[in-house]
């Protein structure tokens, strides 16, 4: 058993602790003097504003989050619009091969498509004939039913509102309103060409060119052309379709855009069943 070691005197322990504390105090004081005073910095407020764009071309989506004008002029999104609304985007037209308005309407909920003959097409919704057609949100009462089955090559999307649209078409119509929204010029250059060959000697060519023209993109243009020829399983029946569309846009101000355009579509069938039994 080891002999017990003598305890240090209490006064010696206190002296050692006091000396250690006194030795550290100057170091703390020096650090406190060297630390710079922190002054809070107040940043200026940053306001970010933007406009929602309803264009569907290049979005890769079957819907749009931008405002629609078919049901009202309030620039409401499809979710905010208090009516039954369907939108067929450019992406869906291309992926499903929806070439004409009639083919598009066959994919829309609540729309009945009736082919009266090889050329004339009528639409019904909620038990009534659809007579309200819009182009870029402007009411257009087509004088011929042939225009009601135009080529989709010039359109960015097609909006369909089921029920009356009295806010945009006056008295409204209990059936539906079909709004065909055309393509707009882009701020960057783009060009697309397509060729299609199918059964019954189907031959189709498309060209779509868009981009800035002058004034650092404040003047833009777009040109779209398509031509199609085809025969059919019906004897002697042939199709000869064409579409031409051109538009110019100019920025007159931060919130003002002037647009002028021209569209022409033709249908020159041979051996159609129009007027025959």
Task: Give the residues covered by each predicted segment.
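Structural signature of outer-membrane beta-barrel domains
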Residues: 53-55, 198-200, 228-230, 265-269
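Short, glycine-/polar-rich solvent-exposed loops and beta-turns at beta-strand/coil boundaries
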Residues: 39-41, 104-124, 151, 171-174, ...
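Outer-envelope exported proteins of Gram-negative bacteria
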Residues: 45, 49, 102-104, 122-124, ...
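Non-catalytic regulatory/gating segments with a bias toward low-complexity or hydrophobic composition
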Residues: 85, 93, 105, 158-163, ...
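Flexible loop and strand-edge segments within Gram-negative outer membrane beta-barrel domains
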Residues: 262-277
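N-terminal Sec signal peptide and the immediately downstream disordered periplasmic leader
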Residues: 1-96, 102-110
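Short acidic/polar hinge/loop motifs at secondary-structure boundaries
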Residues: 113, 122, 138-162, 180-182
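Outer-membrane beta-barrel translocator/receptor signature
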Residues: 153-156, 167-246, 252-256
